[in-house]
Amino acid sequence: MQKIRRDDEIIVIAGKDKGKRGKVLKVLADDRLVVGGINLVKRHTKPNPMSGVQGGIVEKEAPLHASNVAIFNSETNKADRVGFKIEDGKKIRVFKSTQKPVGA
């Protein structure tokens, strides 16, 4: 079970975007995350009239490593760590500071 999943709100704790918050758009297999509005890079794209793609410089989100982010606890307004608990035979994610379920 992953500690950070899609649609979790995270805060960047290291790197050029330190302190910024965003929502996880995609989780990649090698412990990398794509987060909305964070780690933006410029990509030069060729025009492709067949698929209707206009050429130019496009800004898009690049993946960043999971070790550079922490899950954001909206109750405490701080970065938090994730632990696991078994309730009713199911494994659930909980915030370490409050012991409340993540996303509830």
Swiss-Prot record:
CDD domains: KOW_RPL26. PROSITE patterns: RIBOSOMAL_L24. InterPro entries: KOW, Rib_uL2_dom2, Ribosomal_uL24, Ribosomal_uL24_CS, Ribosomal_uL24_KOW, Translation_prot_SH3-like_sf. GO terms for biological process: translation. GO terms for cellular component: ribonucleoprotein complex; ribosome. Gene3D superfamilies: 2.30.30.30. HAMAP family: Ribosomal_uL24_B (MF_01326_B). This is Large ribosomal subunit protein uL24. The gene is rplX.
